């Protein structure tokens, strides 16, 4: 018989840097999950990723307090900021531009996020990411 799902917990945790401090500790502790077991498993799974990059994770907690988790790709905004080499987006994206990204960079981000996005094809995903870039105050070249 399948285990009964008790909860889904969605978090964003820095790759390779999960530890029992907030937000991980309180979110898992109130569900009775072994926090250190999650931290070790998460850090092992994300060790190949760039350290410190935020990684969305969905943790499924079962009634016997066991868990499984699925990592997603980093948010498009984070990947765009990294590609453009900026710290944050523009407060006034329509008037104040803070950086540029090329079509090739957008293609690369779309391919990386393809597994998590619901676009019909790669071109639709590229348009979506280009829209995110424009809303952050980035100029899209190409």
UniProtKB/Swiss-Prot annotation:
Keywords annotated in UniProt: Methylation, Ribonucleoprotein, Ribosomal protein, RNA-binding, rRNA-binding
GO cellular component: cytosolic large ribosomal subunit
rRNA-binding found in the keyword field: yes
UniProt PTM comment: One or more lysine residues are methylated.
InterPro entries reported for this sequence: Ribosomal_uL11, Ribosomal_uL11_bac-typ, Ribosomal_uL11_C, Ribosomal_uL11_C_sf, Ribosomal_uL11_CS, Ribosomal_uL11_N, Ribosomal_uL11_N_sf
PROSITE patterns cross-referenced by the UniProt entry: RIBOSOMAL_L11
Family: Belongs to the universal ribosomal protein uL11 family.
Main function: Forms part of the ribosomal stalk which helps the ribosome interact with GTP-bound translation factors.
Protein name as annotated: Large ribosomal subunit protein uL11
The organism of origin for this protein: Vibrio vulnificus (strain CMCP6)
